C-alpha cells in the first residue's frame, strides 16, 4: 500500500508513541487504518475518552464495532496526533468481562446484601432500586439518598442527573469524582475571579516565552499538550521550561530549571516569588491599581478530616474561607517573611534555582504560562496554591493575554464541561450558580418549570463526606455512575468499604466492567460507553465538543442517560415531594418525575427525526431528540451571563467551540478587551465575575501537611498516574498492548532508601500506613526518580490498592482530597 505524506507522518507518530510505551510499532500500526477509499470502514469524529486535553479522534466502525481510531488531522487541539492511550481507543469497549446484564446480590432468588451476584432483568433491577429509594425517602427523607457522578459523564448525562437529584429527589447529595481532582481549581478561580475555568487557551503555548509546571507531569499526563510545548521549546532556544515537583519525572527531561521541593512547601515558594517581584520593583502598577484588590485569608483552617480526628480538633478555624481587606503595603509585609534564604531552607530547593524562577516571572519582557494539575489541586491547601499562583500573574499583569496566564489542566474528558459547567457538585447549579443563593435557586426552578422551593438550600455531602455518611448510616440509598471510587477514593479500609457494606445501605453501581467499586455494590447496572451513545464533553480550555452515536452497545447495556431518565418514571411526585410543594403547581399531580423533569415541554420539544446520527438509542426509546432538548434547556442558564454556549446543531459541525460563544464567535482569552465580548471598549481588562471587576490578590501563608513522616512511618507517599494507564485502569488494563507495556503497579523509590532497607530492584516490599498496607515491587530506576525519603506509587492497579494507605484529608475549602502526602513505612516482604 502506497502511503501519502500525511499517512507517513502519522505512522512515525505512532512509532514514537510505541517507543515511549514500550510496545512494538507494528502492533500499533495495525490499528491505524486511515483511508476510506481503501477500506469499508465508516469514519466519524469524537473527542477522546481519556484526559481533559480534548483531543479529537476519527473513529472507524465496521460491522457494528469500532475497529480503528486515529488522530483527527482537522482538530486544532491535537492536529492529527494521539498519545499512546488514544491510539488504542478502539479496544476499550471490548474487554472480555464487559457487563451486559444487571447483576443483583441474591440468595434463593431474593435480594440479599451478603448474597452472590446473579443476573436480573432491567425491570427487576429498577423494581428493587425504586423500592429501596422510596423506602429511604419515606423513612429518612431526601438527605439519606445520594449519587456519586463523574467528570466522564457527557454534558447531558450530568445535567439529567442534576435535575433528578436536586429537583426530583430534592437532595443536593450529588457530587462528581471531579471533587477528587478539580475542586480546588474551582474554588481558587471563584475566590480570585468570581468565575470558574481558565481565562486562556491552548493557543498560549505557541506564543509563550516560558512555561512553569507546578505539580504537573505533562509529559505523561497531558502528552499532546506536552508535544506542543516541546515543539515550542525546541524550536526556539530562548524559550524556557521550569518544572517544580516533589520528585523527578519525565517532564524534567525538558526542564531548563528543574526543582524538587519538600512536600507542601510549594506554598512558601509561591510567596517567595511574590516577595521577589515586590522587592525588585517589578510590580505592574498600572495593572494592579486598575484591576486588583488585596485580601488576607483566614489561617489554621484544618484538614477536612472527621471533627473527632486529633489533627482536625486542633484547628482554630476549621473550614473558614473568610478573607478581610488589606492594603498593598500590608500584603508586601506579609510576603516579606518568605525571603530567599528561609524558603530555600524550608523547601530544599537551591537559592540559585528559586531566584531563576522568580526572575522569570518578574521579567516584564517574558510571557509566561503557569500549568498545574494534581500537584496543586490534590493538596490540603490546594485552593491557596491556586490563589497564590494567580497572585504572581496579577502582580505582573501576565494574565488574559496571548502567551501569558495561569492555566489549570484537567484530568477527565468533561470535568469542566459536565462537573463544573453543568454543576454536578453538591453545592452548585449550572453556570457557576450555587444552591445556597435563593436567587440562583429561583432561576433554576423557573427554567425547570418547578414550584418555588423545590431545590433545597442545604449543601449536600461532598465525595469524601459521602463515604463517611455511608459508614455512619446516614446515607442509605446511593447510586454510583461512571467512576470507580472504591479504588480511587482515599482511606479505603477505614471509610469507603465499611460504608458500601453497611447492612443499612443499598448501593447501585453503573459501569461497563466489574470494577472494585462494582464488586462492593448490591446492584450493578451495565452501561454503554463512549461512541455507543451520543455525547458531549467540555475540555480544559472551555471547548465543548459533540459526537454522534456510532455503534450499538452490547445488548443489555444502557447509557447512563437512559438509566437516569427511565428510572425517573418509577416515581410519582406524590412519592417524593410534600403536598404543600405540589399544591403550588396542582397540574403536576399524578405525574412522574420523568414527566416533570424530561417531558416538560422544553426537553421534549425536538422531534427525534432531527438527530443526524445513524443511531440514537435514547431518542428512539423516549420518542424525542433527548440530547438536543437537554442541552438547549441547560444552555439557557449561561447565555447572556458570560457562559454562553452556541446552538446545539453548531457543535456537531465544528471541532469544538470555546465559550463564551457570542454571535457565533468563540472566545480565546477571557476578561481582555478585543477578545472577550463581555469586556467593553475602553475597559482593557475587566474580571467581570467580581461586582467591581477586580481580581483578588490573597495573603495566605505556608501551613504544614496533615500528616508527615515520623520515626515509625518515615517516608512520604505520593500517588498518581502513568502514561499507559488512565485513573483506575478500568479501560486501559483491558487493552492488551497497554497492559503489557505497564502490567503492574510498582513502588518508585530512591536507590539509597532501598539499599538501607535491604531491598533490591524488583523485590517485593510491604508498604504500610496507619490505615492499611499493600504488597508491591520496588523500582529504583526508570521514569520516576523520587528523592530520598519519598516514594511514588500509581493507583491504576486493582490488585494493589494504594488507597488503602492514603489519608482522607482534604482541602477544607474545596473538600478535595490530598493524595500526594501521607506517611508510610516500607519493609522487605
From Swiss-Prot:
InterPro entries: Asp_de-COase-like_dom_sf (IPR009010), CT_Nitrate-R-NapA-like (IPR041957), MoPterin_dinucl-bd_dom (IPR006657), Mopterin_OxRdtase (IPR006656), Mopterin_OxRdtase_4Fe-4S_dom (IPR006963), MopterinOxRdtase_cofactor_BS (IPR027467), Periplasm_NO3_reductase_lsu (IPR010051), Prok_molybdopt-oxidoreductase (IPR050123). Its EC number is 1.9.6.1. Mo-bis(molybdopterin guanine dinucleotide) binds at residues 85, 152, 177, 181, 214-221, 245-249, 264-266, 374, 378, 484, 510-511, 533, 560, 719-728, 803, 820. [4Fe-4S] cluster binds at residues 48, 51, 55, 83. Its main location: periplasm. Residues 41-97 form the 4Fe-4S Mo/W bis-MGD-type domain. It catalyses: 2 Fe(II)-[cytochrome] + nitrate + 2 H(+) = 2 Fe(III)-[cytochrome] + nitrite + H2O. Predicted to be exported by the Tat system. The position of the signal peptide cleavage has not been experimentally proven. Substrate binds at residue 795. Residues 1-30 form the signal peptide. It is found in: Periplasm. Keywords: 4Fe-4S, Electron transport, Iron, Iron-sulfur, Metal-binding, Molybdenum, Nitrate assimilation, Oxidoreductase, Periplasm, Signal, Transport. Binds 1 [4Fe-4S] cluster. Binds 1 molybdenum-bis(molybdopterin guanine dinucleotide) (Mo-bis-MGD) cofactor per subunit. One of its GO terms (molecular function) is nitrate reductase (cytochrome) activity. The keyword Nucleus does not apply. Disulfide bonds: none annotated. GO terms for biological process: cellular respiration; Mo-molybdopterin cofactor biosynthetic process; nitrate assimilation. Catalytic subunit of the periplasmic nitrate reductase complex NapAB. Receives electrons from NapB and catalyzes the reduction of nitrate to nitrite. Component of the periplasmic nitrate reductase NapAB complex composed of NapA and NapB. HAMAP family: Nitrate_reduct_NapA (MF_01630). Belongs to the prokaryotic molybdopterin-containing oxidoreductase family. NasA/NapA/NarB subfamily. This is Periplasmic nitrate reductase. The lineage of its organism: Bacteria, Pseudomonadati, Pseudomonadota, Gammaproteobacteria, Aeromonadales. The gene is napA.
